[in-house]
Amino acid sequence: MLIKSVLSSLPIHILAASAPPKGVLSTLEKLFANFLWGSAETGSRYHWIGWDSLYKPFVEGGAGVRALADVLESFSLKLWWSFRQRKSLWYEFMHAKYLYNVHVCEAEYLPLQSIIWKRMVRCHGLAESHIQWVSQNGSVDFWHENWMGIGPLCQR
């Protein structure tokens, strides 16, 4: 339980606000493994559980620790969802800066743009495939939004 509560919560704030490279994530996971298994002066300790088993939920016999790459992806998807809500000053800024006269479905990353924008564009395909809009008052974009559940018509 200590492993889950301490190790899983430490990088959460970093992953929510930035996009560290894969090398940083693997280094952090190596540090977690060293903390878990440790090492004695005479050599390494016995590994009571495999690292892959730690990532499994409790009900599947694991420790419930989440892989950092999965946490990063979930925060990226959350960023994209927040962006798609269109209800914040942050949305207005990001849309004006990166999507001027372009629909969200046509978002792309160009060199010298924000790392956060790159992170969002990288996950937008996955996010859009799970977003479905319900037309109640005619506010859904007929051509660009996934309102039928088969994806946007512009991608057909």
Task: List the predicted regions and their residue ranges.
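A helix-boundary/hinge signal
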Residues: M1-R156
